[in-house]
Amino acid sequence: MKHITIIGAGLAGTLCGLYLARRGYEVELFESRPDIRNSPTDYGRSINLALSCRGITALKAMNLLSEVNKIMVPMRARAIHEANGEVHYQPFGRHIDEYINAISRSDLNALLLNKAELCPNIKLHFNMKLHSLDIHNKKIKFENKNGDFVEASYHRLIGADGAPSHVRDMLKNEGIVSASRDFLSHGYKELSISKKHTKGMAREHLHLWPRDSFMLLGNPNPDDSITGSLFLANEGKDSFAELNNEEKLHLFFKTQFPDAYAAMPNLVQEFFGNPTGHLSTIQCSPWYYKDECLLIGDAAHGIIPFFGQGMNSAFEDCRILDELLDEYQDDWSRVTPVFYEQRKVNTDAIAKMSMDNYHEIHSDIRNPKFILQKQIERELMLRYPEHYVSMHVLVMFTNTPYAKAMAIGELQSGLLEQICFPITDIKELNWQEVEKLLSIYDKKLAKII
């Protein structure tokens, strides 16, 4: 029987459903929330996401990229705004064609749902909150918007219900998986930067206002407005708890983000009206029960958003699952353990890299030594493209497994430390000495690749 039940009709669940429907499966998607296409908000979740190579590859394989291109905005570099008004720029890639893309979560989700609705072998169910799961008898119970309970049986179940996954929690309660959700001491809040006031800000850039223990981030929108995300401690000094009145809020933004503040006419209403989002990392093992239940996306491996890889790694799950179903002729008893073994090591790696990047963009990004290393790294990629490709480029602009990219990045950190140790300016570099170090690096790299 080729029937699949997917819990969660967000980004990962809907794309997974499209992949499986293409394989001939009868797919039912159950979503606890109302249909996002008919809802005015995105339930307080992060509105803008970063789409890069891994996500693009997964969408392209489903012939969706041409339509997705219409709703995303290129981000060609970081624009780093200092408190004194200075702005510095750091390209993401090696050349003009390497950039990431800002995309609205709700717009992308709506596009995927529209595609799913057109598939005759996909059924969509909204306002169906998972109430209970009988994993041994393959039965599920939902609560609908009227408070009534609806029971159903399933043949095979996929949990794609995000970081607060009920499927994962129910598997954990049965002793089938071990799982934890670790929260950062920081949260985030969505704030808007009006298009009327963004004329002085670079278009097609990811805007960053890093301030050591907190940060404002801005993603561009198609209408030239910017969607901001304020990342701030939940408690203590410079925290959401401390900014508890309008006077404190105005003073904080005037002092810390003066150029952004001037472009935020709705700051007070949005700050006190929008929910504060949580940031967490999910650890779970295994992700499956026999060949009958599988977790994907944030439900299995949710991460903090500071490498822009949450959606991309979830979409990569969908593509790799499809490839394994090809390889093993849809034998799920072989696919599920191999999928877990392949993905777990890589999603653990991107979780660690995301945490490292969290520290990088909060404080390191303005450190003179860090800036020098980035300058040298860029020059290494230009001079020796066959020898040196940075970890960031491997993560964002290739499909290199995350674990391999991380191992290469650790090797590169050592190389850059050696190159930078005696100098304070890139003009002081002795390129003959650099080439000697690069030769040693190449030998170590060969063992990883």
From Swiss-Prot:
Q: In which pathway does it act?
A: Cofactor biosynthesis; NAD(+) biosynthesis; quinolinate from L-kynurenine: step 1/3
The top EC class is oxidoreductase
Top-rank taxon of the source lineage equals: Bacteria
> What is one process in the GO biological process aspect for this record?
kynurenine metabolic process
Q: Which UniProt keywords apply?
A: FAD, Flavoprotein, Monooxygenase, NADP, Oxidoreductase, Pyridine nucleotide biosynthesis
Q: Which cofactor does it need?
A: FAD
EC numbers for this chain: 1.14.13.9
A GO MF label: FAD binding
UniProt catalytic activity: L-kynurenine + NADPH + O2 + H(+) = 3-hydroxy-L-kynurenine + NADP(+) + H2O
| Family the entry assigns | Belongs to the aromatic-ring hydroxylase family. KMO subfamily.
Q: What does the function comment of this entry state?
A: Catalyzes the hydroxylation of L-kynurenine (L-Kyn) to form 3-hydroxy-L-kynurenine (L-3OHKyn). Required for synthesis of quinolinic acid.
Q: Mind telling me what this protein is named?
A: Kynurenine 3-monooxygenase
Question: What is the source species?
Answer: Legionella pneumophila (strain Corby)
